[in-house]
């Protein structure tokens, strides 16, 4: 019988109604009591490192999860993390970069409704996660939700209330789960290196979302205070005329800053070579592109890069474009 470590962190799945709204209050042991069918499937040990609404999750919490998995890695066959849905995609992406080459599954799940309600998706999601974690072919960081298995770097929350809350962006679902049966769409990739854990992140990253007519007034402060700036642009990517000149001047003033372009559009990614607003600035400002990476993956990968990689731009560029847990297939 396989041994699975259950890591409860709060979220809607573990919430109860209070006069101020839903609040995480259900313990890890209580969560497990709602899915007795997994008792004969595996031997489960539960831990509860923190208990948060996922809107309050910060990078330090990701480091805590890495430490928990690292501490228990040799003692368990897999890991199931119960997490809130609002920042689940960020956590899954972050753990994909912080725990690499894991031959053991690290499954993240949650729910749109608390597990103690009569009508809820929580029981199925949690049960599916344990079945997936116990399967011999499972590995790496994945999200299991609404019967779908999504690579940790490809998930995006696309619905606020419906059970099918997450989509896999520009990449197939890895598998589907129905009635405890797993149908795999893609074979898992063999890892050539042993598992590696990274506990350091830098949160000195700013996401600049462009709007029509955006003012450049805050750009100097952003460039001064942040080590990396992710520009969430329109369409395939570019710098609009309203901020083009000051943006270029600041890039020249702060050549050590890491500038990355991503797109506000969910599907099909960026390509700054298409339009004049992108082509020239990409070269002049030495901008990296997200291509088909999600904003969640770009943000957390940048945090990981700043926390663990050399300061020179060439090394960071090479690491940024290296595929990790299916985060990019751009050629």
Region locations from a protein language model:
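ATP/NTP phosphate-donor binding region
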Residues: 1-70, 267
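Accessory alpha-helical/coil subdomains and C-terminal extensions
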Residues: 2, 7-11, 28-38, 151-236, ...
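Short glycine/serine/threonine-rich phosphate/pyrophosphate-binding segments
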Residues: 15-16, 87-92, 122-126, 239-240
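Short acidic, glycine/serine/threonine-rich loops at helix termini
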Residues: 17-20, 92-93, 118-121, 151-157, ...
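Short Gly/Thr/Asp-enriched flexible loops that form oxyanion-binding sites at enzyme active sites
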Residues: 82-104, 241-249, 277
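Short, acidic/small-residue loops that bind anionic groups at enzyme active sites
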Residues: 92-121, 130-136, 253-263
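Internal gly/pro-rich beta-alpha loop/helix module
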Residues: 108-178
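ATP/nucleoside-binding phosphotransfer catalytic cores, i.e., glycine-rich phosphate-binding loops
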Residues: 241-331
